[in-house]
Amino acid sequence: MGWGQVDTVVGETRANVIPLHIKRGRVASRRRAGYRVDGSRQHPSLLSDLRGRASAEQIAAVVREIDEHRRSTGATNLWEVTTEAPLSELAQHVAAVAGFLRQRLTGDYTVDEFGFDPHFNNAIIRPFLRFFFKSWFRVEVSGIENLPSTGGALVVANHAGVLPFDGLMLSLAVHDEHPAQRDLRLLVADMVFDLPVVGEAVRKAGHTVACTSDAHRLLAAGELTAVFPEGYKGLGKRFQDRYRLQRFGRGGFVKAALSTKATIVPCSIVGSEEIYPMLTDVKLLARLFGVPYFPVTPLFPLAGPAGLVPLPSKWRIAFGEPIYTTDYAATDADDPMVTFELTDQVRETIQQTLYRLLAGRRNIFFG
């Protein structure tokens, strides 16, 4: 029956109990034998004699091993040997998150009249964009020294790529590559601010509506400002027209620069045209959804949401020689001939730089 046996003697029933300590003794003997056999394969710190006490030789071996590892890592104690590296990295992340939450909850941050929130920008937006900048598009920047360290300046760049990744990469390039780590304030189409979540994030990143009045206010305040004069004509052009600049509007950006005496810096971006190669624009669907264009690319809409992932083209951003406006008269901002000539000069500079960058490119994805 497993626990005992029952005997019947002349009508009397007696139970013979089998002592369990007999089996326990046998099991313990087998375990001790196994320990002696496997002991040679265990770490010295796990070895012990039958009475559970470590020998002096075993303890000395463990101490020597710890001392050797401590000397090789430069640690001063056992805690540093075992936990310092992983915990310091984890502690940095925890401290960063805790610091961000504390400042947001206590209101210990500032927002300017345009909605620019430097604290949110540095903690959330820029770290997210750096993955695309460094690992996905592998952006190379040249001519960053042409941007002033202080004071207002207007960066004028070509626009392409269906979605405005070029503006995001340009703003990050200025902050991360410029010695002064300046904030670049983009002039953005008003439709963007009507988008849920996106519009609020764009304002927190320091950008504002693309209009002459806002451009004038930013430049007059000494802000580094960027404009894409091609607008939707450049952003939504077909792949066959890549790197061919579209018309630069009516020259409103030149008027703002002339009236504030701000320096104009031409900027050429190569790589943005290939992230969403637009084969055609379905205008009927664009009108139906109320958007400037409805792109058809090799992956969108055929691949569904996967088609929204930009292709990892190799990018180059080149800042050209600055064009100074200090020698222009105050009335030149209202002179159509002056604004037209200056607009054409900026446009031609960007176009020729694009041709030069393309001539030195061997591969779309590897540069």
Curated annotation (Swiss-Prot):
<dbReference type="InterPro" id="IPR016676">
    <property type="entry name" value="P_lipid/glycerol_AcTrfase_prd"/>
</dbReference>
<protein>
    <recommendedName>
        <fullName>Uncharacterized protein ML2427</fullName>
    </recommendedName>
</protein>
<dbReference type="GO" id="GO:0016020">
    <property type="term" value="C:membrane"/>
</dbReference>
<dbReference type="GO" id="GO:0016746">
    <property type="term" value="F:acyltransferase activity"/>
</dbReference>
<comment type="similarity">
    <text>To M.tuberculosis Rv0502.</text>
</comment>
<dbReference type="Pfam" id="PF01553">
    <property type="entry name" value="Acyltransferase"/>
</dbReference>
<dbReference type="InterPro" id="IPR002123">
    <property type="entry name" value="Plipid/glycerol_acylTrfase"/>
</dbReference>
